[in-house]
From Swiss-Prot:
UniProt source species: Archaeoglobus fulgidus (strain ATCC 49558 / DSM 4304 / JCM 9628 / NBRC 100126 / VC-16)
Biological classification of the source: Archaea, Methanobacteriati, Methanobacteriota, Archaeoglobi, Archaeoglobales
Residues the record lists as binding ATP: 7-14
The entry's keywords: ATP-binding, Kinase, Nucleotide biosynthesis, Nucleotide-binding, Transferase
Cell wall biogenesis/degradation as UniProt keyword: no
UniProt-recorded name of the protein: Probable thymidylate kinase
Pfam family, one: Thymidylate_kin
Amino acid sequence: MLIAVEGIDGAGKTTIAAYIAELLKEKGYKVKVLKEPGDSKFGKKIKSSEERLSPEEELELFLKDREIDARENILPALQSGYAVVMDRYYFSNIAYQSARGIDARLIREMNEKIAPKPDLTILLDVEPEIALERVRKRGKLSPFEKLDYLRKVRKCFLENADETTVVVDASKPLEEVKEEVRKVIESFLNLKKNSN
């Protein structure tokens, strides 16, 4: 089982990914939480660059990093019976790079050639103004965190949501967001159980 947690910077992905892992463990699943970009040399280059790279360079680095992550972490965990929760996955790639002009369908196709499709994607949707305020409280803003750009990214996330995606309003207080996510996970697990 592969669950992706997506959203713009400051949406609460890391907190909610950890919460989903707790919920799944309570239900008896072995769980791994993985974060992207990963720790490959390509992921490190994305994280360490002070300035934005060109959209094409960014896409290439994300794809190379994800290919390694899929081969070395995601697929082996799934094959060993783990439920994998992704703190960011390729929908981030689709949203962030299509907001800079690359065709969203092309990005999706390139990603789906190298990485497994999630069974469920939880899109934490939040107004960019709220998200940026949360990020500011954490410390330094990255080059990815500019208001106009995040508005475009949010729009791209919503426009490119697919049949695996459930949109959750992440502007609410954390306990309310968690409660909504818990309902989504329970409904997903029930559907999964009934389809087996």
